[in-house]
Amino acid sequence: MLLWLAQYFQDELGPLRVFNFITFRAVFATLTALVIGLVTGPAVIRMLTRLKVGQAVRTDGPQTHLIKSGTPTMGGVLILVSIGISTLLWTDLSNRFIWVVLIVTLGFGAVGWVDDYRKVVYKDPKGMASREKYMWQSIIGLFAAIYLAFSVSAPSNSQFLDLFIAWVQSGFSMDLPPKADLIVPFFKTISYPLGVWGFIALTYFVIVGTSNAVNLTDGLDGLAIMPTVMVGTALGLFAYLTGSANYSKYLFIPHIPGAGELIIFCGAMAGAGLAFLWFNAHPAQVFMGDVGALALGGALGTIAVIVRQEVVLFIMGGIFVVETLSVMLQVAYFKYTKMRTGIGKRILLMAPLHHHFEQKGWKETQVVVRFWIITMMLVLFGLSTLKLR
């Protein structure tokens, strides 16, 4: 919105031309979201406390967590409000990628809000039924996947529609341009054509999978939010480079016109995340809840698809991946052993993985900081794929 105003008055006020620089707006989007979060955070926490939206803690979990019972949850609302206001203020509102990321973020946030509401009202840690949750996530994820399959390949909305019509007229068998291929990191000439159906399937699993992975990771004070900030910031850099014709050509990455504007959203997400961490650091004054975790994960997945860095997201978000795999393996092994022997056995002391380390004697803060360090290393490794080709 501010960009439009600046462009309208820039002939009379020359210094307003600085708003045309994406990097300038990204910095101030970060600061704006940070300030909004820090200023409104105490009021939001007081409101959540007054509404008695306290977190119901698992009784079969680490005993040290029982003291957290009653801590306000649904703090992800603070993150989403900060991101939304900052993004709308500083971004180019005509950019189609900004809107699809916002819609996915708010859509997954709405699913998480309903889940949190049921947990709070019914005092049930399980919240929304898994089948119902996945249904709504799938609807949003498929919407984004179908749109991005053609939007990533088209420089404008009008060409997006032409591409979609051509696909329908081809009997749903048309291939997509090379820029929609799956990129293999470290190899500048190797990529895999996905086709429309392959692109839709991959995008769906990346968005929905990342959303749930971040949600599973959000089990300790500050554990999920800092890796989200680090991965989101790195994706912002990828977005900036992908949106630049010169940088993308030099680095042998696809040039996606308009993708650079996503650095504004990533900056806002980083600022909002740091503001939330101020209140979520141990001992947490507020929890993110599903409303925040599902939304942030969905945003990360969507941005990674747009900038064609799905594999790099898998690398940088390694903590999210391992946490998810720990749950899947734990459940699968328990069911398998129960079917074979009648007694279910576990691979880990407790899943997700962060609880396993707690049960082994690690303090909560040790688990959190060590996972942060691992994420920082993985993010740097992911960024190295830009040049090591």
From Swiss-Prot:
It is found in: Cell inner membrane. One of its GO terms (molecular function) is metal ion binding. GO terms for cellular component: plasma membrane. Keywords: Cell cycle, Cell division, Cell inner membrane, Cell membrane, Cell shape, Cell wall biogenesis/degradation, Magnesium, Membrane, Metal-binding, Peptidoglycan synthesis, Transferase, Transmembrane, Transmembrane helix. Its EC number is 2.7.8.13. It catalyses: UDP-N-acetyl-alpha-D-muramoyl-L-alanyl-gamma-D-glutamyl-meso-2,6-diaminopimeloyl-D-alanyl-D-alanine + di-trans,octa-cis-undecaprenyl phosphate = di-trans,octa-cis-undecaprenyl diphospho-N-acetyl-alpha-D-muramoyl-L-alanyl-D-glutamyl-meso-2,6-diaminopimeloyl-D-alanyl-D-alanine + UMP. It holds the Pfam family MraY_sig1. Pathway: Cell wall biogenesis; peptidoglycan biosynthesis. It is an enzyme of class 2 (transferase). GO terms for biological process: cell division; cell wall organization; peptidoglycan biosynthetic process; regulation of cell shape. The keyword Metal-binding applies. It comes from the Bacteria. Disulfide bonds: none annotated. Belongs to the glycosyltransferase 4 family. MraY subfamily. Catalyzes the initial step of the lipid cycle reactions in the biosynthesis of the cell wall peptidoglycan: transfers peptidoglycan precursor phospho-MurNAc-pentapeptide from UDP-MurNAc-pentapeptide onto the lipid carrier undecaprenyl phosphate, yielding undecaprenyl-pyrophosphoryl-MurNAc-pentapeptide, known as lipid I. This is Phospho-N-acetylmuramoyl-pentapeptide-transferase. It comes from Janthinobacterium sp. (strain Marseille). The lineage of its organism: Bacteria, Pseudomonadati, Pseudomonadota, Betaproteobacteria, Burkholderiales. The gene is mraY.
